[in-house]
A protein has these predicted regions:
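Bacterial N-terminal signal peptides
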Residues: 9-16
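Sec/Tat signal peptide C-region and signal peptidase I cleavage site
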Residues: 17-22
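N-terminal lobe/hinge region of extracytoplasmic solute-binding protein
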Residues: 28-78, 108, 186-190
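Surface-exposed binding/hinge segments that line
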Residues: 75, 119-170
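Mature extracytoplasmic/periplasmic domains
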Residues: 162, 318-338, 492, 503-507
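Long beta-strand-rich cores associated with HINT superfamily self-processing modules
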Residues: 504-528
């Protein structure tokens, strides 16, 4: 038996020794909780789990509506000055008082070079200023009517704790030498982390000093990484775990037919897409030397037309995905109905490649996670086969998400030529997509922090600036529409594939709240 299997078994065995009266919630995910530093990796699973421990100035309720969090209320004093009134009597888990100093520190920390959440506070150049111990002003260089839309996952950290533990700088997502904040947590939220063994298990207990009123009935939460799909499903069906995510699509009917568990399915707001290196003068992982084929719009369009997303949604995703024409879910942008995804056309794709100077195609390495999104590696395998039909030889490099993100994101200097990624706009608004995916960036992640391939167009930069400050909804939607037309229908900057469906497996004993943002917030879970 492999060491990791033994460790997982030991974790389950230890958990089973708890008293019968204790409501212990055990859950498994396909990937690891790589870091406890909430600024190191802008990833849904990480932010969701840490959202049980850390809190933002705002929160989102079960219906994703913005509600007060660590800020009791806020007001716009003028278009470029917002004031937030902080809750009094809130403490971090180590007993320190939560004050305005922590908010100012957290704002400054979010802009540090290694931070993966630089776009949480926009526009760039926004300053947090302490008014008194429980009041903070945010001074903006230009208006932003949705300033606080992403602050439910901009988690506030203790200034004193970070300074005392050499954690003023965020833990880089690719860091091998883990910082104190990457291995320990000190939040204000409903749970505290009492044990963290990366790759094995993380243990949570209720925070007895939390300022809010608990809705859960859990005495202990144990998270375990189970990367193997079959093992994860077996653990759910046997009762070794109370919750498993994701349930492979081919196992949904089997789980629903069992006596002990069921699958909670619903639409997710995440868009799965493909991206290209459009930045380097020479494509790093290719047999083409001295130039970069992806700088040619004809090549990008050829790749788009060479991929049959309808077949992927039908066969690979077993009809549990909605093909997308845009980099945002139509649930979040009303004018998405005006866009139609082009049908696959291998003949036209070959013609475009020939016109671009690649009549025989070329080779390129594709980076892909194998434990992050639903059927991620299978999607990449399908893309590889489809592109082979137009003369493109794809060398697939599929890796666990820890290695994958460390390679392709800012901490790895965007080390990819062609990649698969997923994106959920934290604000549930198109500006987040434009600012993160279409804004020009540099090698330090300034600008479009998650624009891995560095799509860059000065016209798009102007659209992004205009969208940020436009208050008229109709005018703003038209600006967003024009931006998407530029990015997709003219520049072919990305290949949006689909919005995947959620597939959470849960014990019949569990009452679960499932939101479309796919965050596992067990402070709402109850075990009967």
């Amino acid at each position: 038996m492999k060491l990791k299997t033994l460790l997982i078994a030991a974790a389950f065995a230890a958990a089973s020794l708890t008293t019968a009266s204790a409501a212990t919630f055990r859950f498994a995910f396909q990937g690891d909780l790589k870091s406890l530093d909430p600024y190191s990796l802008n990833e849904t699973f990480t932010h969701g789990v840490l959202g049980n421990v850390y809190e933002g100035l705002t929160k989102r309720d079960k219906g994703l509506k913005i509600i007060p969090g660590l800020a009791e209320r806020w007001e716009v004093l003028e278009p470029t000055r917002w004031r937030f009134y902080l809750r009094k009597g809130v403490k971090f888990q180590n007993g320190e008082d939560f004050t305005a100093d922590d908010v100012v520190f957290s704002a400054e920390r979010s802009f540090k070079p290694a931070s993966d959440i630089k776009t949480r506070i926009q526009p760039a150049g926004t300053k947090a200023v302490k008014v008194d111990d429980h009041t903070v002003d945010f001074i903006l260089p230009s208006p932003n009517p949705i300033l606080h839309y992403e602050w439910d996952t901009w988690y506030i950290m203790s200034k004193k704790w970070a300074e005392s533990n050499n954690s003023v700088e965020p833990q880089p997502g690719a860091g091998q030498q883990m910082s104190y904040a990457a291995l320990h947590a000190n939040g204000t939220g409903p749970f505290i982390i009492t044990e963290h063994q990366a790759g094995v298990k993380t243990v949570f207990k209720p925070n007895p000093n939390w300022w809010g009123k608990p809705e859960h009935n859990l005495d202990e939460v144990i998270f375990t990484t189970i990367s193997n799909d079959a093992t994860r499903v077996a653990a759910l069906l046997s009762g070794d775990v109370d919750f498993a995510d994701p349930i492979p699509l081919q196992d949904v009917d089997r789980v629903n037919a069992s006596a002990n568990a069921r699958v909670l399915q619903g639409p997710e707001l995440r868009t799965i897409f493909l991206g290209f290196d459009q930045y380097r003068d020479e494509l790093k992982y290719s047999n083409i030397k001295g130039k970069n084929p992806f700088k040619d719009v004809r090549v990008r369009k050829a790749f788009y037309l060479g991929i049959d997303e309808n077949a992927i949604a039908d066969k690979v995703m077993r009809k549990a995905a909605v093909p997308s024409a845009l980099m945002i879910s139509p649930l979040l942008f009303p004018l998405a109905k005006d866009f139609t995804r082009p049908k696959a056309d291998p003949a036209e794709a070959k013609k475009l490649l020939a016109e671009a100077g690649y009549p025989n195609g070329f080779e390129v390495t594709m980076d892909c996670p194998n434990d992050r999104y639903v059927n991620d590696e299978a999607i990449c395998q399908a893309v590889t086969a489809m592109l082979a039909r137009i003369g493109i030889k794809v060398n697939l490099l599929a890796q666990p998400k820890a290695k994958y993100f460390a390679k392709i994101l800012v901490s790895g200097h965007y080390d990819s030529s062609f990649y698969l990624l997923g994106w959920t706009p934290g604000s549930f608004d198109s500006w987040n997509v434009l600012a993160n995916m279409y804004a020009c960036r540099d090698e330090n992640g300034k600008g479009g922090n998650n624009n891995v391939g560095n799509y860059c167009n000065p016209k798009m930069e102007e659209f992004i600036k205009q969208v940020l400050v436009e208050n008229d909804t109709a005018k703003r939607d038209q600006l967003i529409k024009a931006a998407y037309q530029l990015g997709q229908e003219q520049d072919w900057g990305y290949i949006p594939l689909h919005q995947q469906a959620l597939a959470w497996g849960a014990s019949q004993k569990m009452k679960i709240v499932q939101r479309a943002d796919n965050q596992i917030l067990f402070y709402w879970f109850r075990k009967e």
